[in-house]
Amino acid sequence: MSTAKLDFVRAYEKEVQNKWESDKQFEIDALDAPDAEHPKYLATFPYPYMNGRLHVGHVFTITKAEFMCQFQRLMGKRVLFPFAFHCTGMPIKACADKLKKEIEQFGCPPVFPVIEEKPIQEVTTAVKEDPLSFKSKKTKAVAKSGGAVYQWKIMQSLGISDEEIPMFADSAYWLNYFPPHCESDLKLLGVGVDWRRSFITTDVNGYYDSFVRWQFESLKALGKVKYGKRYSIWSTIDDQQCADHERAQGEGVGPQNYTLIKLEVVEPIPECLKEIHSQGKKIYLVPGTLRPETMYGQTNCWILPTGKYGAFEMANGDIFVCTERSARNMSYQQMTTGKGEYKCLAKFEGSDILGAALKAPLAINPIVYVLPMLTIDENKGTGVVTSVPSDSPDDYASLQDLKAKAPLRAKFSIKDEWVLPFEVVPIIDIPGYSNESAVRAYKDLGIKSQNDRALLDQAKDLCYQKGFNDGVMSVGPYAGRKVSEVKKIIKDEMVASGQAVDYSEPTSKVVSRSGDECVVALSDQWYINYGDDDIEWKNQTIKQLESMEFYSAETKKKFEIALGWMNQWACSRSFGLGTHLPWDEKFLIESLSDSTIYMAFYTVAHLLQGDVNGSKPGSAGITPKQMTSACWDYVLMGKPYPEGCEVSEEKLKELKKEFTYWYPVDIRVSGADLIQNHLTFFLYTHAAIFEKKFQPKSIRANGFVNLNGEKMSKSTGNFLTLVDSVAKFSADGTRVALADAGDSIEDANFVDQTAVTSLLKLHTQIQWVQETLDSIDKFRSGPLDRIQDTIFESEINNIIVESEKAYQKTNFRDALHLVFFDLQNARDHYKVTTLDQMHKDLVLRFIEVQALLIYPIAPHFAQKLFNMLGKGNILSAGWPKAGAIDYEALKKNNYVQQTIYNFRMKLQVYQKAKLKGKPAGTKAIPDQSTIIVSKSYPKWQQDVLEYLATIYNEDSKSFTKDNNAIAEELLSREEMKPHKKNLMGFVASAIQNVKESGKDALQTSLSFDETSTLTDNIDYICKTLELTSFDVKDFNEIPQASQSKIQPIPGKPQFQFV
């Protein structure tokens, strides 16, 4: 297949990029003072991790920042878009070590055993979380392929030769290899970055290292960094915390804290536990619960009959009956005799302990029994579940099943006395709802059994939310007090008295990049004190949200939720790549904690470092050691010039000028998955360190991007790197497809065919412009005196206005459709309506305006058009000024277009009926076509529209009454009763029209005459519809007998064919 068009487009793209490079188009420095006419604009994007080439998933987010930057440049702003390369943490080290082990084990190049490799698949947890918490449930396992496949093969999949792969066994090689590729790939896409300010992270770069050390010294001085025992996701292989970016599976997963209730096994002892009991040891079943305050209502304990259980000895001699998986977690939480060590005294199936008698703490029932539950997940909690049927729909459903089904009891040899005597025990009263919330929800939702999973999940959320927010204890020492007040008190008392213990585990499966399934460990570590323990800091950060722009209500809501649950965050690790804690050098700062305010480092990086690695000083002539924390305080905090400083104040002033000019961040663009960690840390740390004027102004979040409707996956081959995309579709073809992929916080979709089509359209448009310019003197000139001129000029000006709004809101897909598709449709319409007699000035205006409007999305194409027009650098032109807009002419034009569309649809119906049974090729052109218009609505419809106008709120763009209230009001009117059948259908149609067109849709008449508008366009309409002529008649002019069959209304004529 010929690649001529692709080659043509890529050739001019390269020319444009070379010109940008030679002109240093995107390099920009601070001014001595702000320029009100040309304000600064700083955009940043989370630096990507340097363990592979960039793919369209990365670039989908990058282009949101890129589009905004190019738009702001056109708006006359001085824009800085810097970019850096993240290398901190375990991923690079883990991959390098893995590769080294493969070479040692299998040779170089390695000869691997022939086995089926099964890469980890992307998963979404099906297990219910605490309804009161907010956790990400999606992981990106496929693209990371932690311990699932050989590292050598992963490197091959990145296009690296077998000769070079061994170099990557040294983690330092990664830091030198991928950053240059990342830069060159983005240059291929035409991204407008000031590359002088780029840097790599870790202590390899002494300048960045000194910056991060200063950051943590500042946080510690402010009391934000503390030391103590904390729960965190832990890699047992690496023997340290496993942060999000160090995971092959489970990104976003955090610890889930449970209370393990100690249900003591009493006589008669099950056979499988008798030997242990004979040794005088106390044996406990240990269900994990999120609701310790409900333990008063225990009626039984659930186990999975086919589940694999063990009796594990704890450090204090207690024996816990649970799954081995949970015992493994306990061994990292100082509950067993040694870290990672757990002694199993017996193994058995759940069926072996059915019917065991238990003494349950707090329970009103003195003895409860072990019963079967078939829906227990052995990979969640301890595999043991306590039963509180008053407030847990799952428990109530399972208990009802056992009570109602004798065969089910017989199947598991369950005695009646273990089940039938036990009734629901009311323990929590929810005013206005029930004191047995699970029973009420079970009945209200029509749940039939424990297998009604979706309904039970719904009921569980309902009961948990109502119980926590509105519930009042009705039993125990705290009767009469709200659940939300006493939940923690009851839990703490149970732990203190030895009736329960704290326990934590990952909310879902986490696999480290070293290949092990992670646990939750309780360990001494440095942590950042996010959350309720520093409520002043938390409230300060929450207050920031009020003054920020988030571009969508959903994004802001996610921040509110994240700030609600965010808690202390472990910020140290034992090894990997990164910066050492200044006051405790044996620890490194983890990868999400060293990347919260690095945007400030961009402002001075080009002066400090002479290259991306910081291996030599930059123009300021300052060494890393000279950049002490006191220097950073002067530059970034406005503190006095430090005594005995090795750097002159003049040099530090130059750094300070850059920082104070560029800060704060005007827009931070990121994937929405980072709201739950990085972006919230970003807000917290800015609030702690910087004064109010340097707080971020806006955050723009987006979802993941799919590829051709499917999740991107190397294992399935549905994967596209940036360099491959540019090679296949060109830079602008890729950019247009990325803009068209979607704008919301939900997942978007990059479509190959869109990229191909975009490439072809760009090529076609270049050809059209060239042909047009070659014959421009043949176009009509003189005054713009035709209605078609007015319409086209107004459409151009209106698109200038509307596309500016779309860009400002970061609605880039809307902007694309306006400036590329709608604008070209307007040109094509102008060409047809003028019968190929377009005006020279308007055609040239169209070409220039389209180039300017599409520049943020397709800058190479735009600059090419400007070159063809002989106008030089497109950025010098700035955003086009919109001239006068004749809205009345646009209304008429839209009316004509809609009428043509409706006419064609109606004509097709007529022709289909006429051609039924006729030979192929027969035509059914009507002898006479009539368009019937009406200047007014029927009286009852006028009344409806006038009423709706009175209850429409312009500010909120909504109606102040709902449909039920509207119906009640209108149906109470005597004159509406004859129209009862059609009334609400008309109301619904009117409301929909308002949503699409605004309050104007409620006007009872048009601002223009339909008859004259149609007759003025008769030639165009006939040509478009292939008619010889048509008539226009007023509704009142047609015979009364025909009026009942049709009902035109203003703006929506009807049609007749004879």
Swiss-Prot record:
Gene Ontology, cellular component aspect: cytoplasm
Any matching Pfam family: tRNA-synt_1
Keyword terms: Aminoacyl-tRNA synthetase, ATP-binding, Cytoplasm, Ligase, Nucleotide-binding, Protein biosynthesis
Motif ('HIGH' region): 48-58
Binding locations of ATP: K714
Root EC class: ligase
Catalysis performed (reactions): tRNA(Leu) + L-leucine + ATP = L-leucyl-tRNA(Leu) + AMP + diphosphate
Localization, UniProt: Cytoplasm
Main location: cytoplasm
Known EC number: 6.1.1.4
GO annotation, biological process: leucyl-tRNA aminoacylation
UniProt protein name: Leucine--tRNA ligase, cytoplasmic
